[in-house]
Regions:
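Short beta-strand micro-motifs within the conserved protein kinase catalytic domain, predominantly
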Residues: 76-93
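Conserved short submotifs of the Hanks-type protein kinase catalytic core
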Residues: 88-104
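Activation segment of protein kinase catalytic domains, centered on the conserved DFG
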Residues: 112-129
């Protein structure tokens, strides 16, 4: 996907009240696409973060890097926008990605630790999950990208309990990758 075609129309989405998480610069909510009724994860940059030139460049860089990625263990980038979901005259940058229903790897660890889930990864499943994450990291490095923020919170789990890397906000790439 090229960045030019990555812009989405906020009118095509309905933002829900369900907050999935909060980071330094923004919060992540579920948004429903009104055309296909699919749910997507939507990272919205906090207005108090200030939407200056530096914030614009960070969002553009994250979107540019993420939009070029295609790997089964990396969350799918769907689009970006600078327009507010609630007030079309306001700037409120956002990024939309696929939505994964089982939360993060950290959420899974907490549930297992508190014994509030019947989910258990046997050694084979752990190995397969680790293999997926390491293959995604190999893919990133092969394409000149350094994630710089890999942690359990940035590894999301899909409906089949396969891990996917997300949040490319701190990522950097080597010069010739995006040319």
């Amino acid at each position: 996907m090229d960045l030019e075609s990555a812009f989405f129309n906020t009118k095509d989405f309905e933002l829900t009240d369900k907050k999935l998480g909060k980071g330094t610069f923004g919060s992540v909510y579920i948004a429903r696409n009104l055309k296909d009724q699919q749910s997507y994860a939507t990272k919205i940059i906090h207005s108090e973060s200030g939407f200056d030139g530096e914030t614009q460049m960070l969002l553009l860089r994250e979107s540019l890097i993420h939009s070029k990625l295609n790997h089964p263990s990396i969350i799918k980038f769907k689009g970006m926008n600078f327009q507010s979901f609630t007030n079309p005259t306001q700037l409120e940058p956002s990024i939309i990605t696929e939505y994964l229903s089982n939360g993060s790897l950290k959420d899974i660890f907490v549930k297992i630790e508190k014994n509030i889930t019947d989910f258990h990864w046997n050694p084979t499943k752990k190995y397969i999950a680790l293999l997926g994450i390491s293959d995604a990291m190999r893919y990133l490095h092969k394409h000149g990208i350094v994630h710089r923020d890999l942690k359990p919170e940035n590894i999301l789990i899909d409906g089949n309990y396969h891990p996917k890397i997300c949040d490319f906000g701190l990522s950097r790439c080597f010069p010739n990758l995006l040319s």
